[in-house]
């Protein structure tokens, strides 16, 4: 959530920065905020007058005044009027605060100063590439063709069980998925992340804190009777483990990695990636989440990208890093890098990880704070997250980049101890 105080004090600068992301109505928030502050001032003045009336009556009575004295009667009548007015103001002020809060939830994070300005993904900036020497020269088949030929991927039966955009992994396919998950977790634990296995059903407050609600409600699967949602990413449950908490500053940074199945309706992707593992309603992912001191978040963001990239390098999968422009930036992110892996069948790089720095945006929505030892007050932590990695897309990249002329697939060296085999 954006900082209302910052918006109030610097509306022009705030609006200019936010305009790099699109057109947002900040004036409506400012107008409501002005009304709410006027009501707050009026309430404070009335409360002070009510207190003064009570004090004056008490002093008069203590001094022996007659309760029927006209002055006492007038003060009591005024006191009753003031209390009635206060009673009327309270719901108005409460409703205004709620309306302001709802509007604030619709405003995205401010982009960082070094985020490229652009309307869409065509303005993203390539930062680096790795592994050009590993790009295969004669890869011909798409991963779904390889998987179906080997009998390790079954999409047709998945449609029978559920609908389109689901996959069933069979035999070595299921083993490869499991090996990738275990390898990714092992690597990140070694890098200093603490593994957690969180719930995959999350409540509305959790999705609101991380920024999926209210904007992306149509993208998620909901269990309406229970006010629970199927989590679209482990970012949601892991970050919300600390919602409404005050963390000791000495306990920062907090690093977590988590494997979960993820669920997305993909409502806006009709006709895109209709085959294969790239865009499914249910998929597995290993997520990296950081809660850090504001002074270290920029450095931790760069380190997060390296943690995600280390998986691709260990698998010897060619990839590139893009910095997203303002028009392609996620709703909650202030700055984001995408890692894209090479897919020979498409002859291009495809996203496999997004590594975002949210600054205090999510922490403000989720009320996640920290306290310095010996100091008064609290501050909001900075949160970061990135995929480490999307497992299905990693499998697709392995199948395509490691396919052999005879139709088999070589198992990457680092996965052989997990799979106990060298070839699929």
UniProtKB/Swiss-Prot annotation:
It comes from Acaryochloris marina (strain MBIC 11017). One of its GO terms (molecular function) is ATP binding. It comes from the Bacteria. The lineage of its organism: Bacteria, Bacillati, Cyanobacteriota, Cyanophyceae, Acaryochloridales. Homodimer. The tRNA molecule binds across the dimer. The keyword Cell membrane does not apply. This is Serine--tRNA ligase. One of its GO terms (cellular component) is cytoplasm. It is an enzyme of class 6 (ligase). ATP binds at residues 264-266, 351-354. Its EC number is 6.1.1.11. Consists of two distinct domains, a catalytic core and a N-terminal extension that is involved in tRNA binding. HAMAP family: Ser_tRNA_synth_type1. It holds the Pfam family tRNA-synt_2b. The gene is serS. It is found in: Cytoplasm. Belongs to the class-II aminoacyl-tRNA synthetase family. Type-1 seryl-tRNA synthetase subfamily. GO terms for biological process: selenocysteine biosynthetic process; seryl-tRNA aminoacylation. It catalyses: tRNA(Ser) + L-serine + ATP = L-seryl-tRNA(Ser) + AMP + diphosphate + H(+); tRNA(Sec) + L-serine + ATP = L-seryl-tRNA(Sec) + AMP + diphosphate + H(+). SUPFAM superfamilies: Class II aaRS and biotin synthetases, tRNA-binding arm. L-serine binds at residues 233-235, 287, 387. Pathway: Aminoacyl-tRNA biosynthesis; selenocysteinyl-tRNA(Sec) biosynthesis; L-seryl-tRNA(Sec) from L-serine and tRNA(Sec): step 1/1. Its main location: cytoplasm. Keywords: Aminoacyl-tRNA synthetase, ATP-binding, Cytoplasm, Ligase, Nucleotide-binding, Protein biosynthesis.
């Amino acid at each position: 959530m954006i900082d209302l105080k910052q918006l109030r004090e610097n509306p022009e600068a705030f609006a200019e920065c936010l305009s790099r992301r699109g057109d947002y109505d900040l004036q409506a928030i400012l107008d409501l905020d002005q009304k709410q502050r006027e009501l707050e001032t009026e309430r404070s003045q009335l409360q002070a007058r009510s207190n003064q009336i009570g004090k004056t009556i008490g002093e008069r009575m203590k001094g022996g005044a007659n309760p029927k004295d006209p002055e006492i009667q007038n003060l009591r009548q005024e006191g009753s009027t003031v209390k009635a007015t206060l009673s009327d103001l309270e719901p108005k002020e409460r409703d205004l605060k709620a309306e302001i809060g709802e509007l604030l939830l619709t405003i995205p994070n401010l982009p960082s100063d070094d985020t490229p300005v652009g309307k869409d993904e065509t303005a993203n900036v390539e930062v680096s590439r790795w592994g050009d020497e590993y790009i295969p020269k004669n890869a011909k088949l798409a991963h779904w063709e390889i998987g179906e030929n080997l009998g390790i991927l079954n999409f047709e039966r998945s449609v029978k069980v559920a609908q389109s955009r689901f996959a069933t992994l069979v035999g070595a396919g299921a083993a490869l998925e499991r090996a990738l998950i275990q390898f990714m977790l092992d690597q990140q634990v070694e890098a200093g992340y603490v593994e957690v296995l969180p719930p995959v059903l999350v409540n509305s407050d959790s999705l609101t804190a991380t920024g999926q609600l209210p904007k992306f409600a149509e993208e998620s699967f909901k269990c309406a009777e229970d006010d629970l949602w199927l989590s679209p990413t482990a970012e949601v449950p892991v970050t919300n483990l600390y919602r409404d908490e005050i963390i000791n500053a000495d306990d920062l940074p907090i690093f977590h990695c988590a494997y979960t199945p993820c669920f997305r309706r993909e409502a806006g992707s009709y006709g895109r990636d209709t085959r294969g593992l790239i865009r499914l309603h249910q998929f597995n992912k290993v997520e990296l989440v950081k809660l850090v001191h504001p002074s270290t978040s920029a450095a931790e963001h760069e380190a997060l990208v390296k943690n995600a990239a280390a998986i691709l390098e260990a698998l010897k999968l060619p990839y590139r890093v893009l910095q997203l422009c303002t028009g392609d930036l996620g709703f909650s992110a202030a700055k984001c890098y995408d890692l894209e892996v090479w897919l020979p069948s498409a002859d291009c790089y495809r996203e496999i990880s997004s590594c975002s720095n949210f600054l205090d945006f999510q922490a403000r929505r989720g009320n996640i704070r920290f306290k310095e030892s010996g100091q008064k007050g609290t501050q909001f932590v900075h949160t970061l997250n990135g995929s480490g990695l999307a497992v299905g897309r990693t499998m697709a990249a392995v199948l395509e980049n490691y396919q052999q002329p005879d139709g088999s697939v070589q198992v990457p060296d680092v996965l052989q101890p997990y799979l106990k085999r060298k070839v699929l």
